[in-house]
């Protein structure tokens, strides 16, 4: 952000750094993070352009996302690795497009939501270019916003999760019923269903786990 004249001219930056009472009472590693932020703000003269709220309540989070949407903003997740990315889904459900690390959960989310860009966050130029690109096309931003809202409901809601789970249970039971009716006996080893070929003398060598 500090190296992009385009971003500094057209955007403000809000850093969500958790909740704190007093920076002086944080542990040394946390203090180092804030010190680095202060130095970057000073180096690129970002005074008046960067905010880092002291506290927020869980109930405030949807309102923060929607406020960013009303401003035509982005949700940026520059973590080096992200196993899933619940915050990305929260942002998408509110219609806030993303720029995120090209790793793990964000890949799955983007493949289903198509609501932003992924980039190599270890390459600062690549991250800067992704942010500039995402902010420069308003029609694309609107499409990403709609895509996120629709896709989260379709792919990641609790109703959809339960529906898929019940469908998988039904499909597994259907497989078992068909195998049982065909004469193949069923057993349970270590809590998992196994298939046993009744015509084989070597039982241990003729078991298949059901996928």
Where do the protein language model's features map onto the residues?
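Short hydrophobic faces within alpha-helices
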Residues: 1, 90-92
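Short hydrophobic signal-anchor/transmembrane segments that target glycosyltransferases
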Residues: 1-9
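Short hydrophobic beta-strand element within catalytic cores of glycosyltransferases
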Residues: 74, 97-100
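C-terminal amphipathic helix plus adjacent low-complexity
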Residues: 18-21, 140-142, 147-211
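Aromatic "clamp/platform" in nucleotide-sugar-dependent glycosyltransferases that forms part
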Residues: 80
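Nucleotide-activated donor-binding/catalytic signature segment of Leloir-type glycosyltransferases, i.e.
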Residues: 17-21, 25-69, 73
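Conserved acidic donor-binding segment of nucleotide-sugar-dependent glycosyltransferases
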Residues: 112-113, 117-124, 134-138
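Short glycine/serine-rich donor-binding loops of glycosyltransferases
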Residues: 85-88, 106
